[in-house]
Amino acid sequence: MSDEKRSCTLSDLLDMQHALFEKHKHEWAPHDPEHARSYLLYSVEELGEMIAIIKKKGDDAIVENPAVRAHYVEEVADVLMYLMDNIDCYDITGEELSAAYVAKFERNMKRDWHENKTMYEDVPAGKD
């Protein structure tokens, strides 16, 4: 990928992460279904780092402080990278992921969010 600034497609993200894996495949866990859960757990760990920034620095700092914002965005990228590793473990393509994303978006655009919220109002806390 060149140094020029551009947006990446889901396929780009998957391709870049696969290239990074190929470079380090002798040091990293394999990209196979057996190891997919590990990559998912790593992404959760990175989510924890995002949460820590929010808790320690606050929402305003993420919006207004360039250094805090850069750190937060880097953690977001870490989450995405580990999710791309997980997805690669299952050989899910960018096209599959894009199609699923668009389909979910379209369902959510038609969804009655008020109805969804009210259906859980009578459920006691801590119950499924």
Give, region by region, the residue ranges found by the protein language model.
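Flexible "arm" and connector segments at domain edges
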Residues: 1-128
